[in-house]
């Protein structure tokens, strides 16, 4: 895969998450947008590592998209269930779909970002900002 295809995939996932996902009461922004903003703030407080942070943003977008896609009947997760080490069978969900999606997105984002920024120089501030969502 060339570098332009990777950039296209990242921005495609970013747009899907931020433009299609319905807004919630977090200042009129979607939960995905709120997590992206918190991630960008964590990057600003961390060491300057552009490649690492580009990967962090991509993985965050994939994790949030997959969490959203689990509860959507027509969407296919980007990563989960598509590699040998990560088997997944989609289940039919009965219940409040939007709140389940918000919870799943937040759980995925929190776990990923908490792990990725656990060695950050401002870890206390960073984790506190994650906890605020």
Where are these regions (language model features)?
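Bacterial N-terminal signal peptides that target proteins for export
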Residues: 1-11
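Bacterial N-terminal signal peptides
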Residues: 9-20
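Acidic/polar surface patches and capping/hinge elements
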Residues: 24-133
